[in-house]
């Protein structure tokens, strides 16, 4: 091979390598995204089936049922309510009427949470939850 052919081969391999690295990086990034949905979005079928996502809203009054570390509660956006099952220790700030965001997946119509995040003080509302509640009110 001539010097020029060697250089062209090297450039072609470099372009292929950079393209492959970019593709794999974007694919990994996309697979790790967790989209936020309100109970209304989940009820309307907008949430992914079999994939992890975030569900946010308010913990419905009189809905928390504890059985050891297993907890069942309802999350509402005041239009629709969705049942959540969680096994684990809840945050100290978790209580009925509080804004929360849960991470998990939908299995047989029940949201199985792997993580529960509660808002940090009385005046704070996670932006996603505030937007979802406002959107639900306007429907």
From Swiss-Prot:
Cytoplasmic side: 1-7
Keyword Cell inner membrane: yes
Annotated Gene Ontology cellular component terms: plasma membrane
Compartments, as annotated in UniProt: Cell inner membrane
Topological domains annotated Periplasmic: 29-139
Keyword Lipid metabolism among UniProt keywords: no
Keywords per UniProt: Cell inner membrane, Cell membrane, Cytochrome c-type biogenesis, Heme, Iron, Membrane, Metal-binding, Signal-anchor, Transmembrane, Transmembrane helix
Membrane topology: Single-pass type II membrane protein
GO biological process entries: cytochrome complex assembly
InterPro entries for this protein: CcmE, CcmE-like_sf, NA-bd_OB-fold
Residues passing through the membrane, by range: 8-28
HAMAP family per record: CcmE
Function statement: Heme chaperone required for the biogenesis of c-type cytochromes. Transiently binds heme delivered by CcmC and transfers the heme to apo-cytochromes in a process facilitated by CcmF and CcmH.
UniProt record similarity statement: Belongs to the CcmE/CycJ family.
Protein name (Swiss-Prot/TrEMBL): Cytochrome c-type biogenesis protein CcmE
Organism the protein comes from: Ruthia magnifica subsp. Calyptogena magnifica
């Amino acid at each position: 091979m001539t010097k020029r052919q060697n250089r062209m081969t090297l450039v072609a391999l470099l372009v292929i390598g950079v393209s492959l690295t970019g593709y794999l990086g974007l694919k990994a990034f996309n697979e790790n995204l967790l989209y936020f949905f309100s109970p209304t979005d989940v009820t309307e079928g907008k949430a992914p089936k079999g994939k992890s996502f975030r569900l946010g809203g308010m913990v419905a009054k009189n809905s928390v049922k504890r059985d050891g570390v297993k907890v069942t509660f309802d999350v509402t956006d005041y239009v629709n309510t969705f049942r959540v099952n969680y096994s684990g220790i809840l945050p100290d700030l978790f209580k009925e009427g509080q804004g929360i965001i849960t991470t998990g997946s939908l299995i047989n119509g029940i949201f199985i949470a792997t993580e529960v995040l509660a808002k940090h003080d009385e005046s704070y509302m996670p932006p996603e939850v505030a937007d979802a509640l406002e959107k639900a009110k306007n429907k």
